[in-house]
Regions:
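Active-site-proximal mixed secondary-structure blocks
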Residues: 1-121
Length: 121
């Protein structure tokens, strides 16, 4: 069996059905956020979520700094938010492209069908 290259692997895993979320947190520089599809429930007792972020991500840095984060579950009409938060554009541009509020010290994107505010463990 041939070993797939990274491009082939990316194409295949991109076909896996999953919800789309934006993980958000505040840092000293303001709100940070990144599109994440590697998000799942980890436990019901206690209630825990698992989120996978790139080690070099500004959002991961913000999550670690804040000790809390939001998981914004995007709706069908929020494709623009998914695309903007998946890019490396300046944070100010990302946050100017969506309406958001501060809730429980976490940035929450308005219009999401659901969101979860989490503490870091």
């Amino acid at each position: 069996m041939a070993v797939p290259d990274t491009q082939e692997f990316r194409q295949v895993v991109g076909l896996l059905p999953t919800g789309v979320t934006v993980v958000t947190a505040f840092s000293g520089d303001g709100p940070a956020g990144a599109t994440a599809s590697a998000v799942c429930s980890l436990s019901l007792e206690p209630m825990m979520m698992l989120v996978c972020l790139d080690r070099g991500s500004r959002t991961l840095h913000a999550v670690e700094e804040a000790g809390r984060f939001g998981i914004n579950v995007l709706g069908l009409d929020q494709r623009n938010a998914a695309e903007v938060f998946a890019t490396k554009v300046p944070l100010e541009e990302k946050w100017q492209s969506v309406a958001w509020i501060r809730h429980l010290e976490v940035p929450i994107i308005e219009g999401c069908p659901a969101y979860i505010v989490c503490g870091l463990h």
